[in-house]
Amino acid sequence: MSRFLICSFALVLLYPAGIDMYLVGLPRIAADLNASEAQLHIAFSVYLAGMAAAMLFAGKVADRSGRKPVAIPGAALFIIASVFCSLAETSALFLAGRFLQGLGAGCCYVVAFAILRDTLDDRRRAKVLSLLNGITCIIPVLAPVLGHLIMLKFPWQSLFWTMATMGIAVLMLSLFILKETRPAAPTTSDKPRENSESLLNRFFLSRVVITTLSVSVILTFVNTSPVLLMEIMGFERGEYATIMALTAGVSMTVSFSTPFALGIFKPRTLMITSQVLFLAAGITLAVSPSHAVSLFGITLICAGFSVGFGVAMSQALGPFSLRAGVASSTLGIAQVCGSSLWIWLAAVVGIGAWNMLIGILIACSIVSLLLIMFVAPGRPVAAHEEIHHHA
């Protein structure tokens, strides 16, 4: 079982590493490519667009051909794209490389969740996804630090060579350690069960909405945090970095505690707790009389996301034993596109950073609480504890 957990964690971590590691080198990249930092900030959106594009087909291919035939090309593409970015001499070529990086990371991301659905029952999967969420929270803190240390001695291109090295590690794991987990091709008698695994299932759609809103909350916080903490609250850059590191610490602590909480409380209880924390955070930020209270509200955001997201993802994947890849893709596309759409619309309408965060917190909590309370899970699908190997 450990091989599947190690491979899944490695496959997922390409996604945040591709986002966070290069940011520290952005000023030098812009200077070398004769572009402004503002022009290259679009590289974040281009990377997410690549991920979303990969998710359109990766899940279906993973369900038809297997997990490895998607993971291996995905890791290989991430390696090639990282090298391409390091060799880029214009901003257009750099952005093209970032799109290809997103494609590779998106393929790996989809496969990771499909593998966990294949190999773990509902309760164990919720625990593992919570742990995975905690590990993912480390990357936004460690990646810029690692990038800074690399750039003390080497040029910015070394950041992408480091990403390529990470991709090589994932490729080796996918080639030599990962075993195929896709369930055997459905027989005629399995067709009714396959057809019953509809993406229009009310329970699945409710979890898509809940996880998309939750991701929108955390990405809105990440996007608005420089404005909130430095421009509005007046913290210096060093203090901002410290606060963000502390919020990551809160996220990790709660994420690593959630598996133990699942041994005591029902998943539904933790999901309700998550949304109550979001609601409390929104109200706290709305009425906050001081910076200290506002910072407390921010910690509630991190705790709320960490306690509920892994559980909600596990529940979303639960109904799909034969279409786990497609379900994973659907979740990823909804989360990437939904959160990006909200942030873009809020900016176009002219909603301030503070109100943008408060608005999504309150909307997420109210909608999600209603869905949790009124949309019950259907008949549970048998878990795939036994791995099906293919010749």
Curated annotation (Swiss-Prot):
<dbReference type="InterPro" id="IPR023697">
    <property type="entry name" value="Multidrug-R_MdtL"/>
</dbReference>
<feature type="transmembrane region" description="Helical">
    <location>
        <begin position="203"/>
        <end position="222"/>
    </location>
</feature>
<protein>
    <recommendedName>
        <fullName>Multidrug resistance protein MdtL</fullName>
    </recommendedName>
</protein>
<feature type="transmembrane region" description="Helical">
    <location>
        <begin position="158"/>
        <end position="178"/>
    </location>
</feature>
<dbReference type="InterPro" id="IPR011701">
    <property type="entry name" value="MFS"/>
</dbReference>
<feature type="transmembrane region" description="Helical">
    <location>
        <begin position="293"/>
        <end position="313"/>
    </location>
</feature>
<feature type="transmembrane region" description="Helical">
    <location>
        <begin position="331"/>
        <end position="351"/>
    </location>
</feature>
<dbReference type="InterPro" id="IPR050189">
    <property type="entry name" value="MFS_Efflux_Transporters"/>
</dbReference>
<keyword id="KW-0812">Transmembrane</keyword>
<keyword id="KW-0813">Transport</keyword>
<dbReference type="InterPro" id="IPR036259">
    <property type="entry name" value="MFS_trans_sf"/>
</dbReference>
<keyword id="KW-0997">Cell inner membrane</keyword>
<keyword id="KW-1003">Cell membrane</keyword>
<feature type="transmembrane region" description="Helical">
    <location>
        <begin position="356"/>
        <end position="376"/>
    </location>
</feature>
<feature type="transmembrane region" description="Helical">
    <location>
        <begin position="42"/>
        <end position="62"/>
    </location>
</feature>
<keyword id="KW-0472">Membrane</keyword>
<comment type="function">
    <text>Confers resistance to chloramphenicol.</text>
</comment>
<keyword id="KW-1133">Transmembrane helix</keyword>
<feature type="transmembrane region" description="Helical">
    <location>
        <begin position="245"/>
        <end position="265"/>
    </location>
</feature>
<feature type="transmembrane region" description="Helical">
    <location>
        <begin position="269"/>
        <end position="289"/>
    </location>
</feature>
<dbReference type="GO" id="GO:0022857">
    <property type="term" value="F:transmembrane transporter activity"/>
</dbReference>
<feature type="transmembrane region" description="Helical">
    <location>
        <begin position="93"/>
        <end position="113"/>
    </location>
</feature>
<dbReference type="InterPro" id="IPR020846">
    <property type="entry name" value="MFS_dom"/>
</dbReference>
<feature type="transmembrane region" description="Helical">
    <location>
        <begin position="131"/>
        <end position="151"/>
    </location>
</feature>
<feature type="transmembrane region" description="Helical">
    <location>
        <begin position="69"/>
        <end position="89"/>
    </location>
</feature>
<feature type="transmembrane region" description="Helical">
    <location>
        <begin position="4"/>
        <end position="24"/>
    </location>
</feature>
<dbReference type="Pfam" id="PF07690">
    <property type="entry name" value="MFS_1"/>
</dbReference>
<dbReference type="GO" id="GO:0005886">
    <property type="term" value="C:plasma membrane"/>
</dbReference>
<keyword id="KW-0046">Antibiotic resistance</keyword>
<comment type="similarity">
    <text>Belongs to the major facilitator superfamily. DHA1 family. MdtL (TC 2.A.1.2.22) subfamily.</text>
</comment>
<dbReference type="GO" id="GO:0046677">
    <property type="term" value="P:response to antibiotic"/>
</dbReference>
